[in-house]
Amino acid sequence: MSLIPSIFGGRRSNVFDPFSQDLWDPFEGFFTPSSALANASTARDVAAFTNARVDWKETPEAHVFKADLPGLKKEEVKVEVEDKNVLQISGERSKENEEKNDKWHRVERASGKFMRRFRLPENAKMEEVKATMENGVLTVVVPKAPEKKPQVKSIDISGAN
């Protein structure tokens, strides 16, 4: 473990290393300019939220999207369809109001906006999209149109035999 803290992101993070846990550090910010430390921390927190992770799987019946959005209410999330085949998931978490007399020791929860867009294949039924949100997980289901089977017509073969 380094004795000199990094201005580019703080400490190591390894769940298997008991010395890398985020413990209270009386010297945090002492060796770095406070503005650099604040900017690195803020950038890291905002980046964690703005890069919302989304899983996309395809089943025989539908395209299913799942996004982890902990702490967001369904009113803070939008699911939209644009250009007939683009699914857009967006949202915003507002920063908590600060009181003049409050003394913050640590701010780790991220705030900001996020937006993810997915271009879906032709077989997506965009007019039937359904979205649910439960326990901070947004699930969007886009049904698929049934596959069109080609019509096959048998042709009799004429000739001498």
UniProtKB/Swiss-Prot annotation:
Q: What is this protein called?
A: 18.1 kDa class I heat shock protein
For the sHSP domain, which residue ranges apply? 45-160
Where is this chain's protein located in or outside the cell? Cytoplasm
Q: What induces it?
A: Accumulates after heat shock.
Does the keyword Lipoprotein feature in the UniProt annotation?
no
- Which InterPro entries does this one have? A-crystallin/Hsp20_dom, HSP20-like_chaperone, Small_HSP
Question: Subunit structure of this entry?
Answer: May form oligomeric structures. Binds to AKR2A.
Keywords on record: Cytoplasm, Stress response
A Gene Ontology cellular-component term? cytoplasm
Keyword Cytoplasm part of the UniProt annotation: yes
